[in-house]
Amino acid sequence: MTVEFSGAVTECVRQMLSDQKYNLILEGTFRTLETPWRITEELKFKGYTAELHAIAVPKDISYVGTLDRYFVGKTKGTGRAVDKRHHDLVAEKLPVHLKALAKSGMFRSMHLHTREREIFSTEHDVEAFMEQFQREVERRLDFAQGNRLAKRIDFVDQALAEEERRGLAAIAETPIAEIRRELQAIKKSRNIGMER
């Protein structure tokens, strides 16, 4: 019910603001190709020019980020949990959908960002855009980034322990035991807690 309601409200606000020719920034996960494609075509029909911006984050860091955001938000009453299967589906589909959108010719320019800054932009070079995207999502972490990730994982571990003390066994349908296994796998693959 909440998803349908928020989607309807978002659609209504977008229509109203685009009819009034406001500058718009629309965000989404690119879980499907249909939604960003449809919205871009609608806005171009109304006379808008469009830019494609994507944030490239390694999958493991992204997943830890969803947990971190959930637990931080929960303390403020705004926590929104993400099922790991949904996260992994989005991570799997993102490169495919991003490339299709980039190749569509609908965008004046394409921009690639990390969570910190823009790292690449182009008007037409889809292959270079996608190569840079792949490099970023597959990158190794430097020492400081590894330490930040370790702190986030420790925070999530503590929050999971608190949830277990309260009798919860899952976060957004993902069993806490599965989340813990994933966090351990991330620590191992990133050499966190080991000599770096």
Descriptions of predicted regions:
Residues 64-187:
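Conserved GTP-binding G-domain of TRAFAC-class P-loop NTPases and closely related GTPase folds
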Residues 20-21, 57, 69, 73:
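Generic recognition of well-structured, leucine-rich alpha-helical segments
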Residues 190-196:
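Short acidic DE-rich linear segments
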Residues 31, 44-67:
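Conserved phosphate-donor/acceptor-positioning beta-strand/loop module used by diverse small-molecule
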Residues 1-42:
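Conserved nucleotide-sensing/catalytic segment adjacent to the nucleotide-binding pocket
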Residues 21, 47-49, 106-109:
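A generic structural signal for alpha->beta connector loops
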Residues 33-34, 60, 118-120:
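Flexible loop/turn segments at secondary-structure boundaries
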